[in-house]
């Protein structure tokens, strides 16, 4: 997950900065469910998400193995065992979750197109 090296996104941003154009950068929405959803999210993000009550959210970040920030997100606690993660790189978040979940009871999927986000 080398988010900061996304060459396509960087090229798009530079084109907009140097000219005129339309730039749509919608966050992805990832749904995380399962008995161990909180446990896995606690491994991935730096904030204590156990303190986020249902119906509330937390701005947080994830770090790589060197302690460098690789992404910042908003984690929304929708219900017991149900979280939504607002993330710019949803397709890259899914393998990151898989890498850290081990044998945990968790399922993650992109639900961006089920909801309009602006």
At which residue positions do the language-model features occur?
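Acidic, proline/glycine-enriched N-terminal capping motif
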Residues: 1-70
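Acidic, low-complexity central loop/insert segments
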Residues: 21, 29, 74-118
């Amino acid at each position: 997950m080398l988010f900061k090296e996304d060459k396509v996104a960087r090229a798009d941003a530079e084109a907009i900065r140097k000219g005129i154009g339309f730039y749509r950068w919608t966050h992805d929405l990832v749904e995380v469910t399962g008995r161990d959803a909180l446990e896995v999210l606690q491994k991935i993000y730096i904030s204590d998400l156990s303190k986020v009550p249902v119906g509330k959210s937390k701005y947080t970040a994830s770090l790589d193995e060197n302690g460098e920030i690789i992404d910042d997100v908003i984690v929304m606690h929708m219900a017991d065992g149900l979280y939504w993660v607002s993330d710019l790189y949803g397709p890259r978040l899914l393998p990151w979750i898989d890498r850290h979940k081990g044998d945990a009871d968790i399922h993650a999927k992109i639900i961006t197109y089920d909801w309009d986000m602006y």
